[in-house]
Amino acid sequence: MKSYKLLTPGPLTTTVSVKKEMLFDHCTWDDDYKKITQEIRAKLLKLARVSAGEYTAVLMQGSGTFGVESVLTSVIGKKDKLLIVSNGAYGERMGDIAAHASIPHLIYRQDYDKIPDPSVIEMLLAENPDVTHVS
């Protein structure tokens, strides 16, 4: 079989050592698996500099779009408004997700090969004081 380098977004091309580790079937009820999961969750809270008494980390499996959609549809409330800074496919997809989920939003579009201008973002925030979230 021919070996390919996958040049698409995401961690698709993996090393032999990672592939070998993936050959082992982990069960969610195994103590080793639970220990690994709890360590990851604790490290995420530490990374975010928040207390386990007030916050938790939920590990979710899915594509990048799945992760973005899960955040947009669970963090942004009905009275909130989202400013999407879009200079690529993910930004455009966030606009689609926000529209489909009836999330109040506005989009600052920039060409795919350009860096969004911070002064434009500042202006949009000043003109739209009801914006509560920026992505």
Predicted region positions:
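Active-site phosphate-binding strand-loop segment of PLP-dependent enzymes
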Residues: 116-135
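A glycine-/small-polar-enriched, mobile loop at the entrance of the PLP active site in fold-type I
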Residues: 2-48, 52-59
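Active-site-proximal loop->helix
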Residues: 93-104, 122-124
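Short, surface-exposed connector motifs at secondary-structure boundaries
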Residues: 76-81, 103-105, 130
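Short beta->alpha junction loops
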Residues: 59-61, 108-114
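Conserved beta-loop-alpha segment that forms the PLP phosphate-binding cup at the N-terminus of a helix
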Residues: 54-87, 91-95
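Generic hydrophobic alpha-helical segments
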Residues: 44, 71, 121-125
